[in-house]
Amino acid sequence: MASKGPSYRIENIVATVNLGVELDLEKLAERLTMAEYNPDQFPGLILRLTKPRISALIFRTGKMVCTGAKNEEDLKNAVRALVKLLKDHGADVPFDPEVQIQNIVASGNLFAEVDLEQAVLMLENAMYEPEQFPGLIYRMSSPRVVILIFGSGKIVCTGAKSEKDVATAVQKLYNQLKDLGVLYIEEGEAEEGEEEL
């Protein structure tokens, strides 16, 4: 069996949504039975959707923060569902609000052990202090992401703004480490739910 390239799985997408209108959170909290609203503890109204499984923090200013999406399509569907829910319960919000992805977190596997001691010497913008943290912290400039690299070949990618950025960063990292000679490739298969590159 030939060695395979890296794989990854998106764990969370955080996005902001600008509805462009002020919202009466007290009124929405009364009408939406599933809403959580306790302004003494937190200024936003919390809504949790089950399909897709996403949480939304909704603020009086008309700004929303959505977390929990596993892909961009789920995020779009969740925003549509939230807009419909708000409209159905008296909020005058636009059908197509501005949505901006702030951060995508993905976990992955390079299917190779990584010599972190050598990698930190050869990669620019890399930091490795095993007494403090077992992973190498690599700040990639393009795409602009931070990748935690562990000796086992497991990785965590943060800071991506699109699914394409994640795929590009993981493949680019794999190629860089392979070219530097710090990967010890093993045989293996992608775990369920991971995208193979």
Curated annotation (Swiss-Prot):
Keywords: DNA-binding, Repeat, Transcription, Transcription regulation
PANTHER family found in the cross-reference section: TATA-BOX BINDING PROTEIN (PTHR10126)
Pfam families reported for this sequence: TBP
Keyword Repeat: yes
Family, similarity comment: Belongs to the TBP family.
Sequence repeat ranges per the UniProt record: 10-86, 101-177
One Gene Ontology biological process: DNA-templated transcription initiation
Keyword ATP-binding among UniProt keywords: no
The organism's place on the tree of life at top rank: Archaea
PROSITE patterns registered for this protein in UniProt: TFIID
A molecular function GO annotation: DNA binding
InterPro entries registered for this protein in UniProt: TBP (IPR000814), TBP_archaea (IPR033711), TBP_CS (IPR030491), TBP_dom_sf (IPR012295)
Known function: General factor that plays a role in the activation of archaeal genes transcribed by RNA polymerase. Binds specifically to the TATA box promoter element which lies close to the position of transcription initiation.
UniProt organism field: Pyrobaculum neutrophilum (strain DSM 2338 / JCM 9278 / NBRC 100436 / V24Sta)
NCBIfam families cross-referenced by the UniProt entry: PRK00394.1-1 (NF001592), PRK00394.1-2 (NF001593)
Name of the protein in its database record: TATA-box-binding protein
